[in-house]
Amino acid sequence: MNVLIKKFYHLVVRILSKMITPQVIDKPHIVFMMTFPEDIKPIIKALNNSLYQKTVLTTPKQAPYLSELSDDVDVIEMTNRTLVKQIKALKSAQMIIIDNYYLLLGGYNKTSNQRIVQTWHASGALKNFGLTDHQVDVSDKVMVQQYRKVYQATDFYLVGCEQMSQCFKQSLGATEEQMLYFGLPRINKYYTADRATVKAELKDKYGITNKLALYVPTYREDKADNRAIDKAYFEKCLPGYTLINKLHPSIEHSDIDDVSSIDTSTLMLMSDIIISDYSSLPIEASLLDIPTIFYVYDEGTYDKVRGLNQFYKAIPDSYKVYTEEDLIMTIQEKEHLLSPLFKDWHKYNTDKSLHQITEYIDKMVTK
């Protein structure tokens, strides 16, 4: 969306949010803006249904993931046709919880008693985002101001470590006073059962008898740059392994595994080794004590186009490979030497994180 269209959209949202008055609602109202169900659904489920009215604004693609919660929440699909409905819901909310960058918030006229809390869709960051993303033309003052308006709408950030706090400060212009060191709701699933038992049960369910290598690369805007690993060649060279390619849903590959129905966290729970690149998933995998090999065939290009941060550049070279042959050789020769690199990113991620988050919401919304 170009700068002029964004400017017009923000103007429309600003006018509507000033015209629309808050609806009178019997119970405190919380609105969730959801792109990633794994970040939002744990909070929805944990909140007491009798205390709150809950509304979810989400994409048409993600709306089906809320079917199990249909009795507990109102769902509004985020389309241009429902813009007025979205703003009406926002205006009556005491708290708005988001998991991503939402352009609407750059024009939304927040009321004085509203708070917006960001639960970012990742446990950490190895690539640049926000205003540090090289794709943002920082010399274009209008473009930068449009981004800032969206970022400045957020009052608080849920974080699991100081490193992610640092990323928010660098990339989004956040301050230390905005950090809520409660941990992240997305990690709650890893504390709800014995991991070894869950891993064995899942492997049995999906018929996996070997060690599982999971390839979860980050998304590249040029779809031609998104690669799957040759499954047949990998498994021929490493007969003790089963490989699953889990590419971005928008990437069409007729010759790779159809695992679209299995969410990434379930695949990670089954995995023995992660293969990734600039994604945040290696950070999340470290919480499960799963090592990662970084298959970074386009490292130089990606760094130039998007940017890789100081945490990526601190990864030891022994964990990086640039070809499939080197990847296979590293697993053959060094597998026993690899260990998770990012355990210190989980200082505040605990089995009590979700409870701390809901306690905070109760305190802020019902006071």
What is the predicted role of each segment?
Residues N349-K367:
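C-terminal alpha-helical cap of glycosyltransferases
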Residues I96-I97, D155-C161, I274-I275:
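A short beta-strand/loop micro-motif in the catalytic core of glycosyltransferases
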Residues M1-K85:
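N-terminal pre-catalytic "stem/leader" segment of glycosyltransferase-like enzymes
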Residues V31-M33, K88-L104:
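Short N-terminal targeting/anchoring amphipathic segment
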Residues S280-H346:
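Catalytic binding pocket for nucleotide-activated donors in carbohydrate/polymer assembly enzymes
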Residues M78-K91, L247-I283, L287-L288, E299:
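Donor nucleotide-activated moiety binding/catalytic core segment of transferases
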